[in-house]
Amino acid sequence: MFMINVLTLIIPILLAVAFLTLVERKVLGYMQFRKGPNVVGPYGLLQPIADAIKLFIKEPLRPATSSISMFILAPILALTLALTMWIPLPMPYPLINMNLGVLFMLAMSSLAVYSILWSGWASNSKYALIGALRAVAQTISYEVTLAIILLSVLLMNGSFTLSTLIITQEQVWLIFPAWPLAMMWFISTLAETNRAPFDLTEGESELVSGFNVEYAAGPFALFFMAEYANIIMMNIFTTTLFLGAFHNPYMPELYTINFTIKSLLLSITFLWIRASYPRFRYDQLMHLLWKNFLPLTLALCMWHVSLPILLSSIPPQT
């Protein structure tokens, strides 16, 4: 029975990932005054399926000097961790209702660094290794601010359980009292998922393609799917934290529709940013975090700690 539950979570995620690639190409196309994919199927709707078939029937090449076990294990680990992070997300009911759901998600996103590092190292290519080291430095750095922002939100929430956020936001979305946190959170999620304008790991002009430069066919597709699954997951997480949808237990589908629309709009914002902004320089990327975001988030965290004490009130209890 549990396997059926897992499959009912994984299959829609994989479908969402497939169609997000199509949405991305369409949105970028229209933003650049062109059509995007429109040949395979009506309005190009079958394009992701054609892409998947093409990628998975190609021969998976690997460099002769690569470390085989790690080279194959890295993309599998990347996708597994990307799918595992969906377990505690309330939509409106999570697969497993964890007491420390937020902590679980932080731990899983930290583990995802290993797949990037292994892929870069096992490829035995200078470009891949430099791309991997950049990605690891970027991911680890931005996780610091993500953790502090999460702590501030959880102080308002009063619980580490993600489902409690639905109750906390019945009266007002947390984006209103905590808009500076929400802005920094959104920018940090862009950096965490290695998206433009923070896609330094894929600097085509200098690194060819980044840590996945030696990958082809199936393993490359797994990395690609992991990246897009993480993008959707981060947007869903943002919706849960700052744009909580109203949940009526008698009509849970209303929550799901509300929640899906918000997540889709956030995903399109990701694509809009990609179409609009040029890439950061690497030192600017690190400067933004360590010199700007970190002091601000620490100050706001202290503010959120002191406010309930100042007003001698307590956060909502569960």
From Swiss-Prot:
Q: What is the topology of this protein in the membrane according to its UniProt annotation?
A: Multi-pass membrane protein
As recorded in UniProt, its EC number(s) are: 7.1.1.2
The scientific name of the source species is: Ovis aries
Q: Which family does it belong to?
A: Belongs to the complex I subunit 1 family.
State what this protein does.
Core subunit of the mitochondrial membrane respiratory chain NADH dehydrogenase (Complex I) that is believed to belong to the minimal assembly required for catalysis. Complex I functions in the transfer of electrons from NADH to the respiratory chain. The immediate electron acceptor for the enzyme is believed to be ubiquinone.
Localization per Swiss-Prot or TrEMBL: Mitochondrion inner membrane
Q: Does the keyword Translocase apply?
A: yes
Predominant place of localization: mitochondrion
EC class of this enzyme? translocase
Gene name, Swiss-Prot/TrEMBL: MT-ND1
Query: Which key words tag this protein in UniProt?
Result: Electron transport, Membrane, Mitochondrion, Mitochondrion inner membrane, NAD, Respiratory chain, Translocase, Transmembrane, Transmembrane helix, Transport, Ubiquinone
Query: What terms describe the molecular function in GO for this protein?
Result: NADH dehydrogenase (ubiquinone) activity
Q: Which superkingdom does the taxonomy of this entry point to? A: Eukaryota
Q: Does the keyword Transport apply?
A: yes
| Protein name from the UniProt record | NADH-ubiquinone oxidoreductase chain 1
Q: Name one GO cellular component term.
A: respiratory chain complex I
